[in-house]
Amino acid sequence: MGSHMPYAYHHPKSYEKIHSDDPYRDQYDDTILFHDYVMEKLYETLAARPDFQTLLYFSDHGEAIDLHLDHNPATYVPAMTYIPFYMAFSDTYLSSHPKLIENLAARQKSRWTNDLVFDTQLALMGIRLPDLYEPENDITSDHYDDTPDRFKTLFGTRAITAK
């Protein structure tokens, strides 16, 4: 599963559904369709559980499909840093955590990178670790810092720019 090269190996043949004049892009798009199907089934399974609270999903990296660059640091472009990131919550969780949900709603356009998941995950799970938790790295926190200059990639050598 996933959307890594070679794309054709990351979905069943039955998911070869997109056909255009760009087979490379078609294969990638087919991986996205299959991935969405798997995530939908995962969510349905989890949401049906009485103890379901939250589901957090993010990708490890993006791709530069339109440029046919794959995910290669030698040919880095900012699009490689744009990742899908979403959360789903039970009704119980939503009603029990209104401030957290309000903060998330207010930050739909904020920058976030997957190296910040630790602090966000702690908050989502209600785990308090004062010596480790950094609220500026938690997108659900009142103190989240989305100052553009602090978001870098390639070992801090390249800025992540807004879309």
Describe the predicted segments one by one.
Residues 1-163:
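Catalytic domains that recognize anionic headgroups
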